[in-house]
Amino acid sequence: MLTLHSLFRPTRIVDAHCDIPCGVYDPEQARIEAESCLRIIEKHDASDDKHFRARCVHVKEERAELVKHHLDVLWHDYFKPEHLEKYPDLHDTFWKATKQASKVKQSLDAGAAKELLSMIDTIDEMWKATGGPDKTRVNGRPS
């Protein structure tokens, strides 16, 4: 027998940055997660404890997935068609960075994590040049 609750419960759960949209965007969110991936890889490599190393892999994979999430939100919600005029490679830059986050998720390669950080820095420069700190942060980006 169907209950009233089962009729009105969501058929799937969806996560989003907020999709109000609140208008708060910053590549720093992706960078913090990518830095975590790099540090976790370093800690993993320095440890002989198999249980700790397994935890490192699990948490690093979660952090790398969050990098992808934060990049996707920034790419799809902040950047607009007019930004393509200044940055015709914008889509390719984000696509490659998201693919790089997948590489970090799949491996324990510190070099891959460093490359991801470099890609996020490039995205950060695009964000800054398009007015990101002033347009999307309450009082600009904290220094």
Regions found by a protein language model. Give the residues of each.
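N-terminal intrinsically disordered, cationic/polar leader segments
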Residues: 1-53, 83, 88-122, 126-143
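Long, contiguous binding/interaction regions
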Residues: 66, 77, 95
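Short, solvent-exposed, charged loop/turn and helix-capping segments
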Residues: 70-87
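Short, Lys/Arg-enriched phosphate-binding patches
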Residues: 51, 58, 75
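Alpha-helical segments in soluble extracytoplasmic regions
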Residues: 55-71
